[in-house]
């Protein structure tokens, strides 16, 4: 009898134990606490068009299982005699349940449940580069491939909403939409001036610059008031003030040199920059030295505090949704606190996977998307510091 009462007490205590929000299994009365599935989607070829770093398709890894290979989603087939198109960008819409891939010739969307292509567009044939989604997941801002214009696109259908000319920013290349969804930051490979568009009117509202060199990868703070930009011929970064439109800081990496002869990709020493979610750190690539440098962003100018060796030349960085990891284009997974490499991406054949086009997606136990991250490593502090 005592054993029965003890067992009954245990059952009652378990029933009263709270389950973390969002982790409760749905349907059939199940009450098990389940961890959301945390998957990293990596589009290849994402180091130019070299299929030696992961082949062709979208390679998926499980972050909860030390980034073990899960599957490969087919994208395009190419005859052996034709070089594949290098992937230029990747993004995920939570409400539409779609993943988007851009190449040097097209933009396409796949349903993440069926893994089937939903639509594909080439627009005027001058498509495409690294795009961005508005926070509501409904509109894509897509750079043309090197032209002085961006496409504003309906994310559900691929329909062109507007072809926006950017006379101050040529060589359309990289795009970020602010966390509040009001601004699209437009950087061109052939320009020292960045344009900013008002997403409510789809018109250019201001410019920032002149930067010291043509603007390469960049990121912004969560308030959308500061731009952290790589530029040509600088092992480091510059900071642009959105309010004044001026460049306010130039930060160079100390203790490391570079030369063009030591660069095999992109032609600039730093091609990749990301803010930590709390905006206390800036992480910067150094392709010439196969290194990632970390800066303290709580002081101005930011101070270099740590350097981490990569297995190859890094050309892109972004953060995990939980702030635990930094993803390098080399396929190195970096523990953001310990600042050490804790895993390396390999595909189903054991081949190294390297790509500048990766995005993390978290799924509820029922398979619906819970959250995703932007490929640009945007700061997540929404209010500007006093």
Identify the meaning behind each predicted range:
Residues 1-6:
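Positively charged n-region of N-terminal signal peptides that target proteins for export
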Residues 14, 26-386:
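Predominantly soluble domains enriched in secretory-pathway, periplasmic, or organellar proteins
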Residues 7-18:
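Bacterial N-terminal signal peptides
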Residues 19-26:
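Signal peptide processing junction and immediate N-terminal pro/mature segment
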């Amino acid at each position: 009898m005592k054993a029965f009462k003890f067992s009954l007490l245990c059952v009652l205590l378990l029933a009263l134990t709270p389950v973390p929000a969002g982790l409760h299994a749905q349907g059939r009365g199940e009450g098990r606490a389940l961890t959301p599935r945390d998957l990293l989607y990596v589009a290849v070829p994402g180091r130019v068009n070299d299929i030696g770093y992961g082949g062709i398709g979208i390679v998926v890894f499980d972050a909860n299982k030390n980034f073990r290979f899960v599957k490969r989603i087919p994208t395009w087939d190419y005859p052996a005699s034709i070089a594949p198109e290098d992937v230029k960008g990747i993004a995920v819409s939570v409400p539409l349940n779609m993943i988007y891939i851009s190449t040097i010739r097209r933009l396409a969307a796949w349903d993440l449940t069926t893994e089937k292509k939903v639509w594909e567009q080439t627009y005027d044939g001058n498509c495409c580069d690294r795009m961005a989604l508005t926070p509501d997941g409904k509109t894509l801002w897509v750079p043309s491939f090197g032209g002085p214009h961006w496409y504003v696109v309906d994310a559900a259908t691929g329909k062109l909403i507007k072809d926006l000319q950017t006379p101050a920013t040529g060589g359309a290349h990289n795009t970020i939409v602010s966390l509040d969804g009001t601004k699209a930051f437009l950087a061109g490979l052939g320009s020292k001036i960045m344009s900013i568009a008002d997403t409510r009117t789809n018109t250019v509202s201001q410019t920032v610059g002149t930067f010291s060199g043509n603007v390469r990868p960049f990121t912004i703070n969560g308030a959308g008031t500061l731009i952290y930009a790589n530029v040509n011929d600088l092992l480091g970064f510059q900071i642009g003030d959105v309010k004044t439109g001026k460049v306010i800081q130039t930060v160079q990496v100390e203790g490391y040199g570079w030369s063009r002869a030591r660069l095999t990709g992109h032609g600039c020493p730093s091609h990749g920059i990301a803010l930590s979610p709390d905006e206390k750190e800036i992480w910067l690539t150094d392709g010439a030295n196969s290194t990632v440098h970390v800066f303290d962003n709580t002081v101005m100018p930011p101070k270099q505090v740590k350097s981490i060796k990569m297995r190859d030349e890094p050309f892109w960085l972004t953060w995990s949704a939980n702030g635990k990891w930094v993803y390098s284009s080399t396929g190195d997974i970096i523990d953001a606190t310990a600042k050490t490499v804790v895993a390396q991406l390999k595909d189903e054949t054991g081949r190294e996977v390297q790509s500048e086009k990766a995005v993390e997606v978290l799924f509820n136990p029922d398979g619906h998307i819970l959250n995703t991250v932007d490929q640009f490593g945007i700061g997540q502090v929404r209010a500007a510091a006093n």
